[in-house]
């Protein structure tokens, strides 16, 4: 008699690959995947778990690429925006939309990413941009993420087309 996981239909080759519960086999693979998805839902409650898994896969590939080549994949902006979407619930605009990257509630949000390659922990944004919040995402060389959400009003006033935000200047 063939043992199959009742949840996935996959064949279990050995009794150690699953548990017998209420007259059915359930594979450890299914149980572990379920627990992983529950953990993701706790960490990113407003996000689609599949999108979060894609984000984690991208991080794994980027880290593996760095380990193999000594170089970083140049996907920082997309990683920052994706993190903003899954962690904060930013609803992103279509690609190449002018003015801001997305919305958080009623606020237009500009997302800027500080990569581990950047020489200084600062970003600049166009003063002409249509945003009321600036979300700065900082990524370490170990692919760990931290973020700060800043009101546009708190950016320093001044001449020029760009406003600057320095990570060390604030603990917000």
Give each language-model segment a name.
Residues 1-172:
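Nucleic-acid endonuclease domains
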């Amino acid at each position: 008699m063939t043992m199959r996981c009742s949840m996935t239909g996959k064949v279990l080759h050995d009794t150690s690959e699953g548990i017998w519960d209420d007259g059915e086999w359930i594979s450890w693979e299914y149980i572990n995947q379920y627990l992983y998805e529950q953990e993701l839902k706790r960490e990113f409650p407003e996000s689609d778990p599949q999108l979060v898994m894609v984000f984690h896969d991208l991080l794994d590939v980027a880290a593996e690429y760095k380990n193999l080549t000594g170089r970083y994949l140049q996907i920082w902006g997309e990683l920052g925006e994706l993190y903003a979407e899954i962690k904060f619930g930013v609803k992103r605009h279509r690609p190449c939309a002018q003015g801001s990257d997305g919305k958080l509630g009623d606020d237009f949000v500009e997302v800027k990413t500080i990569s581990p390659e950047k020489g200084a922990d600062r970003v600049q944004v166009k003063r002409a941009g249509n945003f009321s919040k600036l979300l700065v995402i900082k990524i370490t060389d170990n692919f760990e993420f931290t973020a700060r959400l800043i009101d546009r009003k708190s950016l320093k006033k001044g001449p020029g087309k760009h406003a600057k935000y320095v990570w060390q200047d604030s603990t917000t």
